[in-house]
Design a protein with these regions (language model features):
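Short Pro-Gly-centered flexible turn/kink motifs
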Residues: 2, 148-165
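Active-site/ligand-binding surface loops and adjacent short beta/alpha elements
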Residues: 11-13, 21-105
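Asparagine-centered strand-capping/turn motif at beta-strand->loop junctions
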Residues: 2-8, 114
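A residue-level signal for conserved active-site and pocket-lining positions in enzyme catalytic cores
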Residues: 19, 125, 153
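Glycine-rich active-site loops that engage anionic ligands at enzyme catalytic sites
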Residues: 93-132
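Short, acidic/polar linear motifs in exposed loop/turn regions
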Residues: 7-10, 166
């Protein structure tokens, strides 16, 4: 659960996000399950700058609401899902065992990643309110894509849930 309180007299600009990682036997073949979705718009990361390549989104096609992680899935580092597209995503081992579900009704963005070309034994499912800059952005924080704002004297509260199944 997160609570943001603005005790100042000016608007507060902020980003917050969770960074849960889940152990898997092997990244290869894991399933990402997006219930009720047939496809998603996905923004990759420009690795040299560490910024979002929002001008070149990819379409992530799903088969029966499922995307199977392959050898090159995380070549662009993080799959970023903007505009509140993802409110719930499940991660399942390739053999169908061990399923974990992230439920994040207020997340404006969700990042899914594993270290580039490492076949590391984990995948991160991250709910975000705000995210990294778009490639080439040089403006002020208040103008940053996805930045959250909170008026003086106000507070904001939200939470996400992780469900672990066998």
């Amino acid at each position: 659960e997160w609570t943001v309180k603005n005790t100042d007299t000016k608007t507060l600009y902020y980003s917050i996000g969770g960074h849960p990682a889940f152990n898997v036997d092997s990244v290869m073949g894991c399933r990402l399950i997006f219930e009720g979705m047939d496809k998603l718009s996905c923004t990759g990361i420009d690795l040299p700058t560490g910024t979002a390549d929002a001008e070149h989104p990819a379409t992530l096609a799903l088969t029966d609401h499922v995307y199977t992680v392959g050898e090159h899935t995380f070549d662009a580092d993080t799959m970023v899902f903007d505009e509140g597209q993802v409110k719930k995503v499940s991660l399942q081992e390739a053999d169908g065992t061990k399923r974990v579900t992230l439920i994040c009704p207020d997340a404006k963005h969700v990042g899914i990643w594993s270290p580039v070309q490492k076949n590391a034994p984990f995948i991160c499912l991250e709910p975000w309110l705000g995210r990294c800059d778009n490639k080439g952005f040089t403006g002020e924080l208040k103008d940053k894509y996805g930045e959250q704002s909170l008026e003086a004297g106000k507070s904001f509260r939200t939470a996400y849930e992780i469900v672990v199944e066998k």
